[in-house]
Amino acid sequence: GPSSGFFGMR
């Protein structure tokens, strides 16, 4: 998701 920690850019 947009705020998924390190993967926030997904």
From Swiss-Prot:
Name one process (GO BP) from the record. Answer: neuropeptide signaling pathway
For this UniProt entry, what is the primary localization, expressed as one broad class? secreted
Expression sites by tissue: Expressed in the antennal lobe (at protein level).
Q: Which positions carry Arginine amide?
A: 10
Q: Carries keyword Secreted?
A: yes
Cell compartments where the protein resides = Secreted
Instruction: Supply the alphabetized keyword list.
Output: Amidation, Neuropeptide, Secreted
Q: Which GO terms describe its cellular component?
A: extracellular region
This chain belongs to which protein, by name? Tachykinin-related peptide 3
| Species per Swiss-Prot/TrEMBL record | Acrosternum hilare (Green stink bug)
